[in-house]
Regions:
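Conserved catalytic-core segment of nucleotide-activated headgroup transferases in glycan assembly
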Residues: 22-117, 124-126
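Short acidic active-site motifs
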Residues: 119-120, 142
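C-terminal amphipathic helix plus adjacent low-complexity
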Residues: 45, 55-57, 70-73, 77, ...
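Active-site-proximal region of nucleotide-activated glycan assembly enzymes
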Residues: 1-36
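Short, conserved active-site loop motifs that form the nucleotide-linked donor/cofactor pocket
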Residues: 17, 108-110, 176-177
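Generic beta-strand/beta-sheet core signal
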Residues: 1, 54, 83, 112-114, ...
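Catalytic binding pocket for nucleotide-activated donors in carbohydrate/polymer assembly enzymes
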Residues: 125-126, 130, 134-219
Length: 241
């Protein structure tokens, strides 16, 4: 699509890059179950800001975790929820050590267990005020779920495919707030969204409106565009023979 690879990316690929007009993936929404998480269960006061990161463990990079802790430090009335498939002890040690090195109390971290069904996982996302993306390996499915649930997201954009997934998805739902091109912008957006409930509400409204208009939530349209691309590829192949 126009976003997931930079314009100069072709030199790094032996295959010819073929750009679809809007998005390289689309889904017709998600099933959402009944939430099983409440703030009081996690001993989190109702008047605080909750950040969440739900990517799988291999996407966690210490540098990105450090930026997330810097956000927490600048938003004192905040907590950070961490979930995702990973070795529990390793993840807790990673976050706890970096939090302490950045002057953030480990008591503000919560490590969430896995749930029985994906629909429950999505419902539980509603506990978060802001989702913080991973870098240099962004979320993909987790980002789509976040956008579908209408939760503001902060993502750091890089040069490679895996660091531009969330950027492309956000552009396709018409949300630029939270897209960061530098580490500094990532922290700035995280802090700003944590401190501005009105902005969070505006972004959430945009995301929910996008369910009716965005190509990201229109699998039929995407399929037609993909089929058209296949025909164009075949035509070019035949003409070049």
């Amino acid at each position: 699509d126009p976003y997931v690879l930079p314009e100069n990316a072709q030199e790094y690929y032996s295959e010819t890059i073929w750009r679809l007009p809007q998005t390289y993936v689309a889904v017709d929404g998600f099933e959402v179950g009944v939430p099983t998480l409440r703030r009081d269960q996690l001993e989190i006061p109702l008047d605080t800001v909750v950040y969440l990161s739900g990517q799988t463990g291999f996407k966690r990079h210490p540098d990105a975790v450090r930026l997330q802790m810097q956000i927490l430090k600048q938003v004192p009335n905040s907590y950070f929820l961490v979930k995702g498939l990973a070795d529990e002890n390793s993840i807790q040690q990673l976050f706890t050590q970096i939090a302490e090195s950045e002057g953030v109390e480990a008591s503000r971290l919560r490590f969430l267990p896995r749930v029985s069904h994906e629909s429950v996982h999505r419902a539980n996302l509603a506990i978060a005020d802001v989702v913080l993306d991973t870098y240099p390996y962004n979320g993909a499915t987790t980002t789509l779920e976040t956008l579908w649930m209408g939760i503001p997201l902060v993502t750091r954009v890089g040069q490679q495919f895996s660091a531009r997934n969330s950027y492309g998805f956000m552009m396709n739902v018409g949300v630029t707030e939270g897209i960061a091109w530098t580490d500094e912008e990532y922290v700035e957006w995280g802090v700003r969204l944590g401190k501005d409930p009105s902005l969070r509400q505006q972004i959430s409204w945009k995301m929910r409106q996008s369910r009716q208009t965005s190509p990201l939530w229109n699998a039929k349209q995407f399929t037609q565009e993909m089929e058209k691309a296949y025909k164009q590829m075949w035509r070019r192949y035949v003409e070049d023979k």
